[in-house]
């Protein structure tokens, strides 16, 4: 079985490590430029593939079938080659994000949610929150005339905040996309960044005693779902949590080993 990850810059990826815990199959990284995508997808070089930025929308026209979730969100992160050689596209980020909210105990039903950023991950977050019955879901973006970072204070009554922007990861370590202190009734903060494991936004949440979660659980949960699609086998519902804990321990060991003294 030949699986792997398709993207443009993949040196930082934890995906091969995660998939090594999910099955005995190859999972190489495929770094491709935009002009190489068509030839890569149409060649018979893989049985299944995960897709990351910037190609989650690019691959859609090459799919002969799309899951309902992929159609609803408008992006594909999991591709499987069907017996007739054509490609099926799904979006397991939806499952991963939903799993992350559930495990963190973030119940968005009838609550107000703001989502920072308007990229592909933002679409997934919005879709899941609406499906879970959120009362209001507002996307905050720099280019929006109505809901942007300059007037974000009008949403200071938000119950949950979800960051889907890269602010907080390299080279923006130590930066937060918002001032969390204005959100007096915030019940939870989710940051889809997982490296560093605690962004400035999450450190601020910790300081304010607001429950918070990073994106590692989502990453592991979507990988478990993708592996189920690839291999046609079901994993235990706690598999993603077990893998998340294992990776967290490894990341902690790396930090400790790198400390001076």
Task: Describe the residue ranges of each PLM region.
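Adenosine-phosphate binding glycine-rich loop
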Residues: 192-252, 256
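Extreme N-terminal starter segment of soluble prokaryotic enzymes
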Residues: 1-4, 251-253
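Short helix-loop-beta connector
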Residues: 106-111, 184-185, 250
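NAD(P)-binding Rossmann-fold cofactor-contacting core
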Residues: 132-148
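Glycine-rich adenosine-cofactor-binding loop
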Residues: 7, 91-94, 101-102, 110-130, ...
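Walker A (P-loop) phosphate-binding loop of P-loop NTPases
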Residues: 261
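Phosphate/diphosphate ligand-binding glycine-rich loop within oxidoreductases
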Residues: 2-104, 196-198, 204, 208, ...
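Rossmann-like adenosine-cofactor binding region
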Residues: 147-212
